[in-house]
Structure formats: structure tokens, C-alpha cells
Amino acid sequence: KIVMDLVVNHTSDEHAWFEASKNKDDEHADWYWWRPARPGTTPGEPGAEPNQWGSYFGGSAWEYCPERGEYFLHQFSKKQPDLNWENPAVRRAVYDMMNWWLDRGVDGFRMDVITLISKRTDSNGKLPGEYGSELEDLPVGEEGYSNPNPFCADGPRQDEFLAEMRREVFEGREGFLTVGEAPGVTAQRNEHITDPGNGELDMLFLFEH
């Protein structure tokens, strides 16, 4: 049996999707979390980041891209820009890729940080702490950044996305396994996500419990 590691919260910054996304006129322009610098600041300079989120790997969770003139979100390394799962085209591309591997005999997927794919935004699509956002960010910590985890882990559309994945990728297939790495998920939510009746994932592993 072969269970593949699946990383779809983010891609490499060398991925063709990201390279295309640097062009605001490209069809991939909205495939990542791009944001302008804060008003009244100089793009690329400290303090111009869209909000005060810190990366899990240290420093800001935002990296300035001169080619596009905007920042992109990376919860981990700046080499790993976060995909925008709010975009149906992103989800379609992910599901097509998963089907491609299953059609070639893979037996399932171990999904890297899959519970970070849904970000919490306000009614205008703005993230907490962004200029003009209806959502307040958390206070900054000792390193000068706030914690994005409460707004990115186990987000509002996560169940919807995982159930859609189940239908689009696994419906009609037998003998497959889905295992999700689930940062920020409570034991109670674990039960919901792995309940067969909810059609999401078979198993989760949580480092917090």
C-alpha cells in the first residue's frame, strides 16, 4: 500500500502556479493570499505588512514580492506561500491532482497541516488586522508579531472544503485512506471531522493531545 504525503495548504514559491500568480492579469492571480501594503507605508519596509501575523518559523507571515507590488501570506517559510482555498479554481486543481495519483494506484494521502486551509475573513474578505477589516487581530507577542493560529486553524469553511474533497476525489472509490495532520483542532472537533457520517477524513493526528 502507498499513502502519499499531500501538501496543499501551500506550494513552493517556485511552483508554476505561484510564478503565474505574480501577474495580476493572469488567471492564477487570486490563487494565493495577496495583499497590498498598509496605507501610508512604503511597500517592502518594516511595518508595511498587511497585518501583524507572525510565521510559525519566525518573523513576519508576509513577504513582499516586488514583481507584483504586493505581499503574499506564508504561515510557514517564505518559500511556502499559502494557497487561497476560497478560490474554487484552486480547489478544482487540487482535486484533479489527487485524482491523477489515485488513478495511478496510490491508496490514500497523509495530508500536511490540512486544518489550516480555511482562513477567517470579514464580510469583505479581509483578514483580521488588515486595514479596514471588521475583525480585530490578537495583540502582538514578545517577538513583535501576533498569532495567526486562531484565525487559520480549523477555520469556518474547513468542513465544507473537506466534504467537497471527499465527494470530488474519493466518491465511488474503495480501499483508500485519508489521514490529516490537524494543528489547532480540539478533541471534540476531531470526533466531528472523522465521523464517517460527515464525509470528511478517516483519521487525524494532533500534536497537542
Residue ranges and their predicted role:
Residues 1-99, 103, 116-185:
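Acidic/aromatic-lined carbohydrate-recognition and catalytic surfaces
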Residues 109-111:
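Hydrophobic residues within beta-strands of alpha/beta enzymes
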Residues 174, 181-209:
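Noncatalytic carbohydrate-binding groove/subsite architecture in carbohydrate-active enzymes
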